[in-house]
């Protein structure tokens, strides 16, 4: 970029130079060098890996729309702004486990069959700001045979990490879901909601939760 000093003002282009006005000054700069053309991107083998990555990531983004509905009531309450992006990343990690198809053609239903799937999904938090293990001091697991968690009572004053001193009420609710990613279908159930006031006393946790009729993930 250079400044034009002349008794007249120049605006426009001359060969490789562009004259323009900015902040009351007459300036000149060289035209930018042309980047990659549409034709080059479409035909050059250099860009094949980029295009395949884009195809797969777009595929995961579409599938994530249904995934985000599995426990939508909880996700909406969390209001965690990075949730959608983290779901896309999670599904892409699962997609990469498909070793049967070549890159650009891999499928989630194949990646979901890996033995380590439980480890990947169980440690995914919809609300990374307040993950379950940071909220409750007790270890919570879900028993699929009994259709409930391993806790039947809790002392909310001692067992809960309250976000602030003024907080005095806590809501407990369970949700279970099955996801058929191939058909973009899902089934989910929510339990009754248990609301407890903050107190140093043991309170019962009695959930009623319908069992799932479909089992595509296990």
Map each language-model feature to its residues.
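Long, polar/Ser/Thr-enriched low-complexity segments
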Residues: 1-128
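Charged linear interaction tracts used for macromolecular binding and regulation
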Residues: 93-218
């Amino acid at each position: 970029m250079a400044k034009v000093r002349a008794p007249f003002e120049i605006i426009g282009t001359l060969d490789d130079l562009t004259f323009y006005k900015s902040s009351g000054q007459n300036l000149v700069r060289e035209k930018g060098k042309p980047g990659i053309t549409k034709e080059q991107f479409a035909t050059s083998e250099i860009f094949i890996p980029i295009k395949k990555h884009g195809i797969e990531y777009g595929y995961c983004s579409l599938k994530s729309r249904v995934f985000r509905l599995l426990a939508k009531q909880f996700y909406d309450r969390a209001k965690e702004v990075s949730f959608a992006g983290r779901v896309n990343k999670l599904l892409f990690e699962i997609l990469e486990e498909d070793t049967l198809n070549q890159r650009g053609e891999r499928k989630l239903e194949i990646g979901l069959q890996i033995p380590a799937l439980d480890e990947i999904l169980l440690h995914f938090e919809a609300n990374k700001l307040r993950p379950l293990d940071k909220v409750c001091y007790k270890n919570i697991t879900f028993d699929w045979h009994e259709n409930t968690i391993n806790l039947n009572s809790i002392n909310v004053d001692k067992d809960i990490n309250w976000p602030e001193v003024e907080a005095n009420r806590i809501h407990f609710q369970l949700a279970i879901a099955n996801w058929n990613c191939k058909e973009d279908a899902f089934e989910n159930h929510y339990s009754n909601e248990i609301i407890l006031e903050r107190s140093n006393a043991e309170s019962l946790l009695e959930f009623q939760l319908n069992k799932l009729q479909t089992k595509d993930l296990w």
